[in-house]
Amino acid sequence: PYAKMGYWDPDYVVKDTDVLALFRVSPQPGVDPVEASAAVAGESSTATWTVVWTDLLTACDLYRAKAYKVDAVPNTTDQYFAYIAYDIDLFEEGSIANLTASIXGXVFGFKALKALRLEDMRLPVAYLKTFQGPATGVICERERMDKFGRPFLGATVKPKLGLSGKNYGRVVYEGLKGGLDFLKDDENINSQPFMRWKERYLYSMEGVNRAIAAAGETKGHYLNVTAATMEQIYERAEFAKQLGSIIVMVDLVIGYTAIQSMAIWARKNDMILHLHRAGNSTYSRQKIHGMNFRVICKWMRMAGVDHIHAGTVVGKLEGDPVXXXXXXXXXXXXXXXXNLPQGIFFEQDWASLRKVTPVASGGIHCGQMHQLLDYLGVDVVLQFGGGTIGHPDGIQAGATANRVALESMVIARNEGRDFVAEGPQILQDAAKTCGPLQTALDLWKDISFNYTSTDTADLVETPTANV
């Protein structure tokens, strides 16, 4: 009877300092949704399965999480949105590990629930202030790169596994020389028998430095420093710094604590930190269980990464357009207002934490440039992996096609044209004087990955009359 034990309080007045969480609760048949929601509140804060006398030794009314609102999810029969408030004192300052151990620690295996999903959180300013936030942030990154008013362009070296160091460096050089700002290691290239990390760093940085000399622009290659232990990660990152790299990357799978450590290292060493969300779909893709990717975006902004993969709107990986825009908003805005159709359930003030740059990658190509610029805006890294490396005339041509497509779209935008409607025409005009772009448009004109997303918003705007 969690509800009777004080974990259900419909009259609770939310404090500015409370951490708020929204769970999608699917109770087992016969379990009352309010009771199920109170159980989630209890099991993620102070309760255990029975009443214990040691409760009397604590200020237990203060430390109980309170479920304060339960709504049925539209168009479902057995799912409910449970709003839960946690007192800020339940959490250790500046520790994502502790936050997740509480909120997502034990409740997901709870028997009274068929499934449970963490949909959104509101982190109070007082709590956010205990986190460093992004090491560099989008403003400083633009100043370091000397690139303003347009998205950054990147590409991932393909094939992701099997290249030797020298050939890997060639790919980096050609992509950057063709006009990209960044090339990146893939998430699973660390230090394998076919190419050890030091060899890759040396050849890649040679490619970067030559491309910079040729183009006169600042460029970078995301050197993946992911490794088995924190000591090895630091060793690789230090070596990358000695070679003059401006950016390193880590995978989400190294864990929240390691990511926070790397973010602190990155700020101390004036390094941009790119986070690849490797492994996130294991818990973020299903609609009824796990957690929503936007929660990870929020945690990662607190942890302090500069780039995070946030979905593409038009590519090959999972992501509903509306929700992808929202994941991007969580990363970039200074204060996000509640927006139910986008799945943003709470207002969130980010205090003075810097902004993360969202990264769009996976199955995008230059023929979609107008849509990408429209949906994602300018503070984003557009990564064309196959869209660069897969160009018939070679990597440098693929890079040039992407850069020309982007620049033509930005010029049209600056001239005040409707670049979304005129997008295909703008690209065609630009392609008249750029062979590689023409080739790319001809090759990929019809490719798009049209599957319905498994993770879509539940609350949809419905048109009302007389407005």
UniProtKB/Swiss-Prot annotation:
Q: Does the keyword Cell membrane apply?
A: no
Q: Which reaction does it catalyse?
A: 2 (2R)-3-phosphoglycerate + 2 H(+) = D-ribulose 1,5-bisphosphate + CO2 + H2O; D-ribulose 1,5-bisphosphate + O2 = 2-phosphoglycolate + (2R)-3-phosphoglycerate + 2 H(+)
Q: Name one GO biological process term.
A: reductive pentose-phosphate cycle
- Residues the record lists as N6-carboxylysine modifications: K184
Q: What is its EC number?
A: 4.1.1.39
- One MF term in GO for this entry? monooxygenase activity
User: What keywords are assigned to this protein?
Assistant: Calvin cycle, Carbon dioxide fixation, Chloroplast, Lyase, Magnesium, Metal-binding, Monooxygenase, Oxidoreductase, Photorespiration, Photosynthesis, Plastid
What assembly does the database describe for this protein? Heterohexadecamer of 8 large chains and 8 small chains.
Q: What else is known?
A: The basic functional RuBisCO is composed of a large chain homodimer in a 'head-to-tail' conformation. In form I RuBisCO this homodimer is arranged in a barrel-like tetramer with the small subunits forming a tetrameric 'cap' on each end of the 'barrel'.
Could you identify this protein by its name?
Answer: Ribulose bisphosphate carboxylase large chain
Please report the organism this UniProt entry assigns to the protein: Chondrus crispus (Carrageen Irish moss)
Organismal lineage: Eukaryota, Rhodophyta, Florideophyceae, Rhodymeniophycidae, Gigartinales
- The gene that this protein is the product of is rbcL
